[in-house]
Amino acid sequence: MQASSISVKITDRIFGILNRIPYVAFYARTRGWEFMLSWGHRITGLLLILYLWFHLITLSALSIPGEYDAKMALFSSPLIVFLEWLLAIPVIFHAVNGGRLMLFEFFGYRDDTAMIRWLFAVSAAYVCLLAVFMFLGNQSVSPIFFWLTVFLIAVICGYAFLARIWRLGHSPFWKFQRISGVFLLVMIPAHFLFMHLNPAVGKESAVIIARMQNFFVKMVDLAMVLAVVYHSGYGLFSVGKDYIVSRRLQILMTVLVAAVMVLSAWIGLKIVIRV
């Protein structure tokens, strides 16, 4: 997987910008980009967990459509729309960097320089594509066609990855965290893209409710909620275990993370089922 001249130009520009940030430049020079990307993966993961809660709180207002529409009216200002676009950066970075780690861990690909270049190039292409759709604001696609296509791709990728890691000596919890990551690598960027094809798709209660009441879309949403909650919870557990030495504190952390994730799953499943 050689980096093309286009990806090299894109990533050189991105590296040039990042190297102007003193903190980033210092650690990239002294610890390497692999260290920076590792911490970036953890930080973006935490940001996305916070966004998950915000998303659940927002969607809970769908039980009263008028209240939901009133809230969404507050999110129509140019500043909020710009912040929504910025949120795509941690979304796609976490997804694509997760793919890089999987290639490294399980498929033996060791050209990390090329993978890092592709990470930044793909991320840049995604946020630019999203910016185009958000600027146009008039795109549409059949929800059934879109999610059937995306869901099949995600399931096929997840199954192929499961076949790769099934015989490894790790626990089922560890394996499912990786499989859920492959599934979400496809689903979450697609979800983010779909929700910004036009303002009505993500901000008009009638449009959202009509889509979520479709049986197949409801099943897709349920699968996505469970995968996101599990992947997030196991990620928090893994990060905490790296820094918490005490066995008692590890148990306490595990209980707290499990409780928060069960609560998140309950809220998410209730929203999807009741709509």
Outline where the language-model segments fall.
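Membrane-embedded alpha-helical bundles that constitute the cytochrome b-like, heme-associated redox core
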Residues: 1-275
